[in-house]
Design a protein with these regions (language model features):
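Short beta-strand element of the conserved SAM-dependent methyltransferase core
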Residues: 522, 573, 692, 783, ...
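Long, contiguous binding/interaction regions
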Residues: 697-886
């Protein structure tokens, strides 16, 4: 997630065009023409031995002759010269380079050359980039684009050209327009980090085909989406499309899971993409999901209603006060309701009056105005009057307004006026609703990600025992474990299983059944038959010895006939579970080539297709994330909300999914887990049949996960000066209530020292940002006192690293009544050790000159203390490398 060199790429002060030309069909000509036409106000240096000047600009014969080192170079020559030219640019000290084309055979050499010279690369096979706020058009596109607040990042030149052409027709602006190409060096995660902090960018749109590093993408996207809406269109949903794009894109539901986990929103096609661009460019952030619809015809309003219903949207309910004001203002034949049909004879004045009344109310969160071509209210005239009314209304900034001027030719000018006025406008009622629901879903995603997770009850795990069992099985050469072998592993994580016995033949099966009691179930054991149902390999409700013997022999006979070469490892014998009113579910964990382990929930079946029959999540899961997965399964009808007799216990199933997640996170030896069926009966969840694929694992356990899990290994018990022992551990999302209680025990003076302002209270969003952190980017250690089953926070220290992992900003806060126990120092020592081990170079912070305790502590810990009395601050800097040496 490095930001090194991005400033030189996205805000260059000078640009060299290598291979500049005066021949109109050459890349060097097109690049020079676009750079000069774009209004770039820095030096543009054409490099070519063939021309003395290019488009009136003095040319230089080679890179060595350049009068100074350019920030950015663009290679427009034959691809065979790429490596030699890049080497020359590196020796010159150039910081960034755009490579327009390069064969795959060059990629490794180009990457190595760039690394050697500390140079950043965009591309190869990149269309280039446009930065309208800098007057920069370093691309092949002749299309000029306006300045705007939307940034677009694309992995496809074709899609980039399409969006540029579409945006030009609608006079839509961008802050940045970046075509990544093959992402040999600079990738989407680094650009997300940059754009998240860019003041000219208020929203981001991504077109993606593949990812080089899923974890970096999820981390960067999650961080950026907390402040700016990000929409994604992802191609390659089908295997055929993946082959066409020549990508290993992974399971499409895994993309959905990652996008949702990061707080982004996915659009499904180019039609939605265009609507999304319009929405992100002009729409205000939503306050809620209640929609009010105004129309001058029933049919367009009905189309909007149908679309809203299909998206599970929510209509606003008007208050009686608002209804009465509308009755007084509108003709008597207008029925006051939502949608509000002003009828086809409605004038522009009726629209404006209605808008004024509605904007004064607080009955809705977004207002959709539909206009069908009408002689009573001409499209352009009504648009102009509506724009003026919105511009001068004192409450217009509190409402998200969407306009839908139907028709093509007659409404074209009206839509142009809306775009100029910064109001989102759409061609159809359905497209308008789709755009609205995009923002509703984005808001819901962000709200869900900030909810405080519930604490699971009776959550147990014995990682050491599970590891031992897995290692023993691997040492014995096992690659797959059956139900009876998996049982102790699941039980180590608190999951219920049915007691299971192995019978080698029908006689032994009868003997076991007699011992455990009837009724029983028999299940075939064969590594060669993937689905037992193919040979009726599961027999249930066997109530006598004769039934058991006959069933066992029948299973063996069917295998010999249908699968004569199959190996038979006997039978599993289980007591029959109570299936009365129970529901059968399936939980599967599989490894995705892009996102690593995935947790899938569905109802199963012989020909199980997770893309169609399951909902998917990325581990690790907490109770909130698990509950969202269950609810998503119910809403999408992948699982039923109830069995014949009782509703599904959502909380209980969520807890089981958390247990599965913990098992997968802790045990990298697990390649695949299949619990099928999982019997849900009231609050009881029992794994009846389980298979587990395993393999030796070496390396970093966390690296295989798309989201970094809670690092248990950093927990530490510490003894304070008064002899009390407390636990130092990483902060958790579940800590929000305890953190709020901790802050209430800190004096106003100490809070002022910490936050440099008077803090009356912290909102839920503030506390969520403090507790729901990305351990890849931020670390917060809390000192907790454990009393019985409760925890009490005594102190907090925190470090937030920059994307380059060089500097981190730190802070520390201790409960005011616990000073003098050495707690602050021990927390700081813990943080210093962590940041140093994490590869950071410097730890920085600021405090106030009169915070003598913090200043003294910083000096003792080796910080450089810079007292700046004029600024009223004290700068604190610790060189972590020097401290380690000392």
């Amino acid at each position: 997630m490095s930001q090194r060199g991005l400033e030189a790429l996205l805000r260059p002060k000078s640009i060299a065009v290598i291979g500049a030309s005066m021949k109109p069909n050459r890349a060097g000509y097109l690049m020079m023409r676009n750079l000069l036409a774009g209004g770039f106000n820095g030096p543009v240096l054409p490099v070519t031995p063939a021309w003395k000047a290019v488009l009136g600009v003095l040319a230089w014969p080679d890179i060595a002759s350049l009068p100074f080192t350019p920030d950015l170079a663009v290679l427009c020559t034959n691809a065979s010269r790429n490596l030699a030219l890049l080497e020359e640019l590196g020796e010159k000290g150039c910081k960034t380079c755009i490579i327009l084309s390069a064969p795959a055979s060059q990629h490794e050499d180009l990457r190595a050359c760039a690394l050697r010279h500390n140079m950043r690369l965009l591309g190869p096979n990149s269309l280039g980039l446009l930065a309208p706020w800098q007057g920069l058009n370093a691309s092949f596109s002749p299309v000029p684009i306006k300045r705007g607040k939307l940034a677009f990042i694309s992995q496809s030149a074709a899609v980039s050209n399409t969006i540029l052409d579409w945006a030009q027709q609608r006079e839509m602006g961008f802050s940045y327009f970046i075509a990544l190409g093959d992402s040999l060096d600079i990738d989407v995660d680094e650009l997300l980090d940059y754009l998240a902090r860019d003041s000219k960018t208020s929203a981001i749109l991504l077109y993606l085909e593949q990812l080089s590093d899923a974890r970096r993408f999820v981390s960067a996207a999650r961080s950026a989406s907390r402040n700016k809406p990000i929409l994604v269109i992802k191609s390659g949903r089908s295997p055929a499309a993946q082959r066409l794009l020549n990508t290993t894109a992974g399971m499409d539901p895994a993309w959905d899971a990652a996008i949702q986990r990061a707080g982004l929103l996915r659009v499904q096609d180019t039609h939605e993409l265009f609507s999304a661009v319009e929405t992100l460019s002009h729409m205000r952030p939503l306050r809620g999901d209640r929609l009010m619809i105004i129309s001058n015809g029933a049919a367009p309003a009905a189309l909007a209603l149908d679309a809203l219903w299909s998206h599970n949207g929510k209509l606003a309910t008007l208050s009686e006060e608002t209804c009465q004001k509308l009755r007084d203002a509108l003709p008597g034949h207008v029925a006051i309701s939502n949608p509000l049909d002003l009828r086809d004879d409605a004038s522009s004045e009726h629209y404006v009056k209605t808008l004024d009344i509605l904007l004064h109310s607080q009955d809705f969160d977004a207002l959709m105005v539909i206009h069908s071509p009408s002689a009573a209210a001409p499209a352009t005239e009504s648009a102009q009057e509506l724009i003026e009314a919105v511009k001068h209304h004192p409450r217009s900034k509190y409402v998200s307004l969407l306009t839908n001027w139907c028709g093509e030719h007659s409404s074209q000018e009206a839509r142009r006026l809306f775009s100029e006025a910064g109001l989102p406008t759409y061609r159809t009622p359905e497209g308008t609703i789709t755009a609205f629901m995009h923002m509703v879903e984005y808001r819901r995603n962000q709200k869900q990600l900030r909810e405080t997770p519930a604490l699971p009850s009776n959550l147990t795990s014995n990682t050491a025992e599970a590891h031992l069992l897995l290692q023993q099985a691997i040492a014995e050469g096992a690659t797959s474990l059956d139900t009876h072998e998996v049982q102790p592993i699941l039980q180590a994580y608190g999951m219920n299983t049915l007691p299971t016995w192995i019978a080698s033949d029908s006689t032994e099966a009868v003997h076991i059944a007699e011992q455990i009691g009837y009724p029983v179930a028999l299940k075939l054991r064969s590594p060669d038959i993937p689905h037992k149902s193919e040979v009726q390999g599961v027999m249930l409700y066997l109530r006598t010895a004769n039934e058991v013997q006959q069933a066992a022999n029948a299973i063996f006979d069917r295998v010999k006939m249908a699968w004569p070469q199959a190996r038979i490892h006997g039978l599993l014998v289980q007591s029959m579970a109570n299936r009365a009113g129970a529901q059968e579910l399936r939980v599967v964990v599989e490894h995705d080539p892009v996102f690593g382990p995935l947790i899938m929930l569905g109802e199963g079946g012989v020909e199980w297709r997770p893309e169609d029959q399951a909902v998917v999540a990325l581990p690790p899961l907490n109770m909130n994330l698990a509950r969202y997965l269950v609810i998503q399964g119910i809403k999408s009808k992948k699982i039923r909300a109830r069995s014949a007799l009782r509703p599904l216990d959502v909380a209980g199933l969520s807890q089981l999914l958390v247990q599965v997640s913990n098992l997968i996170v802790d045990c990298p030896e697990i390649q695949r887990l299949d619990i099928h069926p999982l019997l849900a009966s009231g609050s009881e969840f029992t794994a009846l049949d389980v298979t587990l694929d395993i393999a030796p694992f070496e390396g970093d356990n966390e690296s295989r996960l798309a989201v970094r899990p809670y690092p248990h290994q950093l927990e530490e018990w510490v003894e304070l000066k008064n002899g009390e022992r407390c636990l130092f551990r990483q902060i958790l999302p579940e800590d929000e209530p305890q953190l709020q209680q901790f802050i209430s025990r800190v004096t106003k003076e100490d809070l002022y020292y910490r936050y440099f302002s008077e803090i009356n209270e912290f909102t839920h969003e503030d506390l969520a940002n403090m507790t729901q952190i990305d351990y890849d980017r931020e670390m917060a250690f809390v000192a907790v006192r454990r009393i019985d089953q409760t925890e009490e926070i005594l102190g907090v220290t925190r470090a937030i690293s920059d994307p380059d992992n060089i500097d981190a900003e730190f802070a520390v806060l201790v409960r005011s009544d616990l000073k003098g126990l050495g707690l602050g120092r021990r927390l700081m020592e813990k943080l210093i050790t962590y940041t140093r081990d994490h590869g950071l170079q410097r730890l920085n912070g600021i405090t106030m000159p009169n915070n003598r305790g913090m200043v003294a502590l910083a000096r003792k810990l080796g910080f450089n203390v810079d007292i700046q009395l004029e600024e009223g601050i004290v700068g604190l800097t610790l060189n972590l490398a020097q401290r380690e040496e000392s």
